[in-house]
Amino acid sequence: MEILIVGTITVDPERRDAVLAAIRPLVQKTREEEPGCLEYAFTADTVDDGRIVVVEHWQDESTLAAHFVHPNFLATKNRLHERGTGKSVIRKYRVDVSEPVRDSEKRYRADFFTIAEDRS
């Protein structure tokens, strides 16, 4: 089952860009080198200059477990701590269904419409 990780890390607003620049090569390496990595991003919050947003998408639990002991993860974690990032609130979610936000008629849908179509 796919896993999403979503959260935020607090950082001094004056240091946020430097923190992101410091981890950028490691984020890139994670995307390129780690099997099962479907998305991996640390990005500036568009409203709060003191927040970094974390979004990860992993193929399954085993690929996420491998990531947590991979040198890229350990180096990223160390760089974040060395640069004085603050509190983080990061959670993982199991994905049981995935589908587009818009249907075939380009309407935005909050419901999981492909499941409803499969049941009819």
Label the model's feature ranges.
Residues 3-10, 41-70:
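Short, well-ordered beta-strand segments in beta-rich or mixed alpha/beta enzyme
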Residues 11-13, 60, 94-97:
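Non-catalytic surface loops within mature trypsin-like serine protease
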Residues 25-37, 57-92:
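An amphipathic, aromatic/His-enriched active-site/gating alpha helix that lines ligand/cofactor pockets
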Residues 3-42:
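N-terminal first-folded block
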Residues 14, 18, 49, 75:
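Residues that form or flank phosphate/diphosphate-binding pockets in enzymes
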Residues 42-50, 76-120:
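Glycine-rich beta-strand-turn "strand-cap" elements at beta-sheet edges
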Residues 16-18, 63, 99:
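Intrinsically disordered, low-complexity acidic/polar segments
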